[in-house]
Amino acid sequence: MESAAGEEGKAAPSLPLATLIGRELRGGGSERPLVRYGHFGFAKRGEDYFLVKPDCLRVPGDPSSAFSVFAVFDGHNGVSAAVFSKEHLLEHVMSAVPQGIGRDDWLQALPRALVAGFVKTDIDFQRKGEASGTTATLVVVDGFTVTVASVGDSRCILDTQGGVISLLTVDHRLEENVEERERVTASGGEVSRLNLCGGQEVGPLRCWPGGLCLSRSIGDTDVGEFIVPIPHVKQVKLSNAGGRLIIASDGIWDALSSEAAAQACRGLPAELAAKLVVKQALKTSGLKDDTTCVVVDIIPSDHSSTPPSLSPKKNQNKLRSLLFGRRSHSSVGKLGNKSASFDSVEELFEEGSAMLDERLGRNFPSKANSSPSRCAICQVDQAPFEDLVTDNGGGCCSAPSTPWVGPYLCSDCRKKKDAMEGKRSSRSTACR
């Protein structure tokens, strides 16, 4: 790299101290991290699916706009909803983000685009008239920024180099989520266990009609409208030390705690880590359900591709265990000695409301915006000033020249919104 000091007869220009400090702080994250991943699973019913797209581009042909996407879909009552979501969810999310915006605006727009994409996927699948459903956990990695959207109970955790484990999803199981139980009953659903002859209750809490154990999913046309596809969304920025994501179906999490899953695979490369997590779950509980695990390592570009959490000797112990079926008690990695400031995770956004107008905005567009607007769900262009729901709160997501005041909801999709919120039936009102 050439510098002004290397040119004879020219003095380096003086810069304010604040500018130099700012450059130094930004410089630590200027190089994009390496993303390494692995996946593994065993099938019992064959209803788990996953998605791995490590080389996506926001702007075709522009490598600086690269991002990666990883997802797990745990289907139930058949595979149709899981397959449909795997094939269409990312497309619908990206179509809800306008072209031509910069990276900062894209990251700000992403949480709302994820909501719109999940709902669009649900509406399109319900048009097929099939009764299956699926969980969905979609993870977008852009540099050191991680955005996770989820419905159901396919959990995603973050394990940092300092050994701190963070949960990036919320389980939408009625048995464990009090807020979701209250929402379902307030919307007209009944929450109870299965009743055997004689009135004995068995099994986990379920919502009726339908008997689903989850309060949020994609699909499930045969259950009440209070089962919604609106995801919990969380966005975090990792420190320059990076971290490891573990995304898995409940076949893993019913057997292992978040801590056990993270500790089971520390120090191994992602592909072997995913295999070891699945093996540990099977060792703990047996093959009771489909088990799928995706491990994603976000690694500083100046580090090796293996997370430096364990010494080489302990790595060898883990590898022997994986290959030969035995694991030393000493193979569990010790927490690193990184300082909290070096390994901190900054929370940028978190929202889990099931109310669409809270997630996409509830105001009308300003009259200054005279261009046609596109419904965030059905992706149909609307005439100016047509009945829309939008966020017009100061253009938090803006293109370089004019503010972007979307996403919008057309009147048909607002009917679907009202139905999901328990205000009316939507059997004939899904957007066309």
From Swiss-Prot:
The keyword Amino-acid biosynthesis does not apply. Gene3D superfamilies: PPM-type phosphatase domain. Residues 27-298 form the PPM-type phosphatase domain. It catalyses: O-phospho-L-seryl-[protein] + H2O = L-seryl-[protein] + phosphate; O-phospho-L-threonyl-[protein] + H2O = L-threonyl-[protein] + phosphate. It comes from the Eukaryota. Binds 2 magnesium or manganese ions per subunit. It is an enzyme of class 3 (hydrolase). Mn(2+) 2 binds at D74, D250, D289. GO terms for molecular function: metal ion binding; protein serine/threonine phosphatase activity. Disulfide bonds: none annotated. Its cofactor is Mg(2+); Mn(2+). Keywords: Hydrolase, Magnesium, Manganese, Metal-binding, Protein phosphatase. PROSITE patterns: PPM_2. GO terms for biological process: regulation of intracellular signal transduction. Its EC number is 3.1.3.16. Mn(2+) 1 binds at D74, G75. Belongs to the PP2C family. This is Probable protein phosphatase 2C 33. The lineage of its organism: Eukaryota, Viridiplantae, Streptophyta, Embryophyta, Tracheophyta.
